Structure formats: C-alpha cells, structure tokens
Amino acid sequence: MKLLNYALVYRRFLLVVFTILVFLPLPLIIRTKEAQCAYILFVIAIFWITEALPLSITALLPGLMFPMFGIMRSSQVASAYFKDFHLLLIGVICLATSIEKWNLHKRIALRMVMMVGVNPAWLTLGFMSSTAFLSMWLSNTSTAAMVMPIVEAVAQQIISAEAEAEATQMTYFNESAAHGLDIDETVIGQETNEKKEKTKPAPGSSHDKGKVSRKMETEKNAVTGAKYRSRKDHMMCKLMCLSVAYSSTIGGLTTITGTSTNLIFSEHFNTRYPDCRCLNFGSWFLFSFPVALILLLLSWIWLQWLYLGFDFKMFKCGKTKTLKEKACAKVIKQEYEKLGPMRYQEIVTLVIFIVMALLWFSRDPGFVTGWSVLFSEYPGYVTDSTVALVAGILFFLIPAKKVTKMTSAGEIIAFDYTPLITWKEFQSFMPWDIAILVGGGFALADGCQVSGLSNWIGSKLSPLGSLPVWLIILISSLIVTSLTEVASNPATITILFPILSPLAEAIQVNPLQILLPSTLCTSFAFLLPVANPPNAIVFSYGHLKVIDMVKAGLGVNILGVAVVMLGMFTWIEPMFNLHEYPSWASNFVNQTMP
C-alpha cells in the first residue's frame, strides 16, 4: 500500500521514464532517420496527451532530441520556434489587453444582451451571441471568465425574483381568503352546514394533494440545495453555464485569431504549402462563420430542450414582462450603468479594433482586389501579422489621457504621458506557453519532413484512397473530436497535422478537404471539464456535475461534426475548389521527393 502511494505521488516522473524506455527499442533496432524521428514523435505526443511535463516544456524537447539523433542542427531547430504566427499573436494580444483593461468587452456583452431581451430563451441566446462575438477576437478563456460573473448575477436575480413573486402571490391569496364574501348565515341557515359536510375533503382530494405537493416541494428544495428553490432553477443555472462554455468555443471557430488551434493550423499550412495563398483572415471567416452560426443556433435549441424542455411559449417576444424578466432586465441595466458613459480610451480601442478587422478582411478577400496590391512588387510579403503589428504598436503610442495638465488660468503645470497599455500589462496577458508550444509544433513538423517520416506515413496511408472521400473526412473528424477531449487542442492539431497532410497527398485529395474539418473539430472539446479552460471555468461555479457536461457535450459534438460535414460538401467546396487536386500540393510533393 505504501509503495502504491509513492507511485501515485511520483506518477509523472515514472510516466516520463517509462515512456522513454518503452519506445527506446524503436531507434535502437531500426536504425533509420524515420524510426528515430518516430521515437521522438511518440515520446512528445504521449507527454502532451498525459501532461506528464508542462506542455511548453515538452515543446522544447525537439530542440534537445533532434540534434542528439542527428536529424537537425540545433540552429535549424531554434529557427523553427519563432514564425509569422508569433507576430500575429503579439498584435492580437495587444488588442485584447486594451479591450479588457478598459472594460470594452463588458460593455459589448451587456449591450448585446440588452438588445436581445430578458425572456429566458432569448436571454440565453443573448449571452451565447455576445460570448461568441467576443470570443472571435479575445481568447476563449478570458471571454468565459468575463461573461460568467454576469451570468451568475442574472441567474441568482431570477431565482430571487421568482421567490418574491411567489411570496406576493401567497400573500394575495391569504388576504383574499381572510376577506372573502360575507355569507348571510340567517338566509342559508342549515344549508351551510350541509354544504360543509358535503365539501369536507376526502382522502386523495385536491386539498390533500395540495398538502402533498407542498411537502414534495419542500423535499425538492432540500435535495437541490439551498442555492435553488426548485429543480427548474437548478436546470436554468446549468443551461446558462453550459451556454457560456460552448458559445465561447464556437465563437473562436470564426476567425483565424479566435483560437490558438486556428492560428497553429494556418501557420503549419502556409509553411508546408507556401504556393497556396487561399487561406487568410477573410477567406477563413467566409467559410467558418456559417458553420459557427448554424452550430450556435442548434446548440441553443439543444440545451433549451435538454434542460428546460421545448415549449414555443418560451420564444414569445411580447412587450408584457413577468416579474422575473423585469428583475433580470434590472440587473443587466444596473451592470451596464455601472460602466458609465463611454470613455475616450474605449472609443480609441474600438476604433483601432474596427480598423484592424477591416484591414484583415480587405487585404486579399479573393472575390475583389485587396489593398495588398499596393505592395505587388513584393507578393506574399505583407500578411495578417503586418496589420496586427501596426495596430499593436498604436496601443503603445496613443496616450490614455490628456498629456498636459493646466490650471484654471490655462497655464500648463505638468506633462503626463501614459499609453493605452504598458509593457507589463501586455506581458501579463501574453500566453507565452502557447507561443512556445506552437514553436515546438513547428520544430516537430520540420523534423518529420527532414527525416522523411512524413513521406513514409503518406506511403503507408495510400491504401485509404480506396475509401470514399466523405468517409475519410468523417473518420478523421471523429478521431480528432475524440482525441481533443483528453488532450489539449493545440497539442492535438500539432500531433495530427504531420499525419493528415501526407494522407491527403498520398490519396491525391485536396489537403484542405481533410485538414479544414479536422481543424474545426479540434475545437469541439465539449464533454469534460478538463477538456478546455472555458469548461473548467463554468464548472468551478458549482452548478454542474461531470455527467451534466457529458450529456450536453455529446449532443453538441454530434451536431458539430454534422454541421462541419454539411459545410464541407456545400458552401466550402466551391470556395476552395476542393474537388480538384491543386498544383500547390503537387509542387510540395515534387520538392520533397528524393
């Protein structure tokens, strides 16, 4: 028993040693570069999945192991750790820092909820819409962390409003009973006594049933706990929590910068296929926005049905509000009024945000000529990261308040220059662990390419070409969706990209046809609290059990894969000419052939 306790305490250390030793015969027996790289890939993949070491520390292992096995020089590996992705990430984090510092995100969320209304069904959709919109530009984690306190306050206010409404109704009922119609006993005389005898409640009558129902209600309150008056209140809290968790993830699908998974895929893809210039901010938004919108609406309906039942009365849009809805609207309005009028800092941040989004969309939209033609002498030199860096630098240049202080007479008495954000504030928001993790993924992909492991995997997967393309896409999507529940999303896409790309090349299918659905499905971590940070944040509020998230998440996972499959064979296929094997993929295969 003592030995088992020691094993549990040192389980991470034992797992690291065990993994290294178990796969060690592979490079010792099969002395090829492919086998040596496969050994490194297996070790890193297991460390990422189990998190035996921190993800960012595991991401540094290629810098240690590739030179030791003679696959890549140390200087070559080091150059893979900083790419165009990191410049884009820096610019986006500058924007996110300013948005959160000046509370612009809270103003946007509350305003969107106020626009939608406070009817329970529409309120949930309002929270989901605002959360998804914010998640397009901020990290999923920070979005969920910001919206959840508002949702919690609204939920508690709804519960207290219902209690107040019931208390009011009960008071009114008691007063009505006490001041009922006066009956002239002299007129009805003996009939009154006869009626009393006739109306004496019998066992099982409605009077007894009322007592039983009140007793059951009391027991129900005891079961559901002091926080909830009834099971319905508990279900409503679960619904709101899950709606925030899932919508923060769904919103991140919409833009390249919405989640680290999209950024990692974009950089990997552009590095592997530099001749393909079809993926940019605008094209990504055009194909992914319908996917996210459909999935958001279906998830809303699914969660409504699962926790509150599906009743068309819930979707009414009448002007008459119940006491509960009025209380809910009051809370949201009070939260919004606390922010005060829109400040100078919020306006500047909003303007930079809008300009940056417009520049991203218009750089090279595809259906019209973008502003990138201004740099036609250097095609491909200007990317989305260029826009992000320009915007990011502006946050360090534009002052957050008036530069000078004056007396009432108009004399300048002091100069005070503070930018919208400072370097320390930026550092506190910058996800350095993700930056290192992505760099490790790039280094791992380069090692697989240099060693020939990617080509070897592709040759072994070529028999899958006999299967229908839709079945290959479905299988890969289901595998990714399952794996991302137990491994982090960035680790999942980093591990699978070097496998799925050679698969597409081997069976002569447009790589985007397999990689796009797999990338979207990598974000479908809806089942477990540990699957992604937004799930963990909403789980920490204590309204949910693991089984609640599993039941709801399973339905959203199925809906997600179905919507992605629908999109791949409808609007996405003509956008990227997925039915043709592109020349840029052929060029890559020819370049890597010995």
Swiss-Prot record:
Compositionally biased spans, kind Basic and acidic residues: 192-220
One Gene Ontology cellular component annotation held by this UniProt entry: apical plasma membrane
Region (Disordered): 192-226
Disulfide-bond pairs as recorded: none
Annotated localization: Apical cell membrane
Biological process (GO), any one: sulfate transmembrane transport
InterPro entries, A to Z: Na/sul_symport_CS, SLC13A/DASS
Glycosylation sites: N174, N590
Membrane topology type: Multi-pass membrane protein
Keywords: Cell membrane, Glycoprotein, Ion transport, Membrane, Sodium, Sodium transport, Sulfate transport, Symport, Transmembrane, Transmembrane helix, Transport
GO molecular function: monoatomic anion:sodium symporter activity; secondary active sulfate transmembrane transporter activity; sodium:sulfate symporter activity
Signal sequence annotation: none
Catalytic activity field: sulfate(out) + 3 Na(+)(out) = sulfate(in) + 3 Na(+)(in); selenate(out) + 3 Na(+)(out) = selenate(in) + 3 Na(+)(in); thiosulfate(out) + 3 Na(+)(out) = thiosulfate(in) + 3 Na(+)(in)
Record function comment: Sodium:sulfate symporter that mediates sulfate reabsorption in the kidney and small intestine. Can also mediate the transport of selenate and thiosulfate.
Family membership: Belongs to the SLC13A/DASS transporter (TC 2.A.47) family. NADC subfamily.
Identification of the protein by name: Solute carrier family 13 member 1
Protein source organism: Mus musculus (Mouse)
Organismal lineage: Eukaryota, Metazoa, Chordata, Craniata, Vertebrata
